[in-house]
């Protein structure tokens, strides 16, 4: 890919934003929203909305952005194969500029986390600060040697589950109220759902992972078995959510969670029968309606995952928010 010898200011800014991978920022918001709803303590004031915005900036553009930026810094050679159009391998940003991007994002995330934690105060404030600090630390060792957690799915998937699922949920829950057992249960389910989805997301880089010695599940056991492992985790998450909803006395939400489980399993069967072309009727949704958000891929299994992700995320998101809202309502 040919790149001008010197990019203009606007193009440099665009390259820095692309390095932070804005399409990934929104991934933490459902967990933040559910965490806040489960607290039942947020008030419709400007103050509380600003706190929620600070939490989103901390885990979204800054925290998630840092994880994407630092990953590109350490994976330059791998990205030349898997994603050669990214800012650093394409030459739009130098490795030093990429490093500066990640350092600035890290410092801003830490600063905002400390400020928010001190503002909230007490044990809740400590939970917020500890969550963002540990999430940032995990994001670093995910990509950086010598640990480089992403080298093996057994360490990379839990790292993603914590940073994208558990930590945002717990932090948002602590923002306005005490962290209760119900919140810990729901945060744990978000942790496992994130694990299940990141397993499937590795389809897009299977060839590069194999050449680079990374042990993704797809490389180790193949596409069909990877689908089977991920679907088992997803179905267990739905089943446990239904059980929790029932034991907490939420009868109507229990029905909707079970309905979501059944619908998800119907789609899963089609993908297991045809890992490359299953649920092809949703192709237009990926290419047109959601293509810019979810991304596109030349790998058939990854495109199948993108189609499934639309349906699964909608089913889990709605049920997760409903149950979290009922928990919060119980403590009003």
Language model regions located:
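Multi-pass alpha-helical membrane architecture of UbiA-family
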Residues: 1-332
